[in-house]
């Protein structure tokens, strides 16, 4: 099966796993997905992630994070830039998510980073998704 948009597939799997209250989630691995998982862990949206290999295929395992009253750390995750409609911004145009309560994840010439890091570094790029 060929995926047109692997990032949207990752975000949809995360959303579905949270709605089903699953503790962990397996997705096909790629360098971009590993970088997105790294940012989600740094920002406290997932508890951990690791790359494994099952049946000769690389798999990224995400461990989802829940609070003491079983509320998920991720309330919503949305895809911004899509294959049919790419969204590029300069470092001065990076939007804030929920007034700073959420994050943007961008791909920049300096790698994958949050909107806050991109503003601080002074680089723009493609907005992949918003998480809050």
What annotation goes with each model-predicted range?
Residues 1-132:
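Core subunits and conserved enzymes of cellular information-processing
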């Amino acid at each position: 099966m060929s995926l047109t948009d692997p990032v949207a597939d990752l975000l949809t799997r995360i959303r579905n796993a949270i709605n089903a209250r699953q503790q962990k989630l397996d997705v096909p691995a790629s360098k971009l997905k590993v970088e997105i998982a790294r940012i989600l862990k740094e920002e406290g949206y997932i508890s951990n992630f690791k790359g494994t290999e099952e049946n000769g295929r690389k798999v990224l395992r995400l461990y989802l994070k829940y609070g003491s009253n079983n509320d998920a750390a991720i309330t919503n995750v949305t895809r911004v830039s899509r294959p049919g409609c790419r969204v590029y911004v300069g470092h001065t145009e990076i939007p804030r998510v929920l007034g700073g309560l959420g994050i943007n994840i961008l791909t920049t010439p300096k790698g994958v980073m949050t909107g806050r890091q991109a503003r601080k570094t002074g680089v723009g790029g493609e907005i992949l998704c918003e998480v809050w």
